[in-house]
């Protein structure tokens, strides 16, 4: 990411919140996750990916094969992978200790969302999550 700001196109924001709310409505609630795609610092679409974590209520793990397939489709479309998203269905949209331990894509956006519509974006620097401004 070359900017300290992430712009969300309205359709991408709505798709994202729909996915987050769908996960939160499960019994028990589950974190959802996926890929952020667009150009520059503008998020134009999301690509949901199955959460294969052992405890999806409190953790996420992107399905590796599905992630690879979707990354290839983003690249073939001419868009770029901007980063990844996941939800916190029962807590604030801030990086947890687990999020910090598992972050592995320096320079990419990590977007964390809550079902109530709150969301925060960060760039992982390989050491810390640097907050990004979100604009609509």
Model-identified regions with their sequence ranges:
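Short, well-ordered beta-to-alpha junction loops that form the rim of enzyme active sites
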Residues: 87
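Conserved beta-strand-loop surface patch within small alpha/beta domains used
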Residues: 1-81, 90-136
């Amino acid at each position: 990411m070359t900017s300290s700001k992430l712009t969300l196109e309205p359709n991408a924001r709505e798709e994202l919140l729909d996915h987050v709310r769908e996960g939160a409505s499960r019994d028990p609630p589950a974190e959802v996750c996926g890929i952020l795609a667009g150009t520059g610092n503008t998020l134009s679409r999301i690509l949901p990916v199955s959460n294969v974590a052992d405890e999806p209520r409190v953790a996420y793990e992107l399905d590796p094969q599905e992630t690879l397939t979707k990354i290839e489709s983003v690249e073939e479309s001419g868009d770029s992978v901007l980063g990844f998203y996941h939800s916190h269905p029962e807590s604030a949209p801030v990086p947890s200790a687990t999020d910090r331990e598992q972050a592995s894509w320096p320079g990419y956006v990590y977007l964390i969302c809550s079902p109530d519509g709150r969301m925060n974006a960060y760039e992982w620097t390989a050491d810390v999550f640097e907050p990004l401004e979100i604009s609509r």
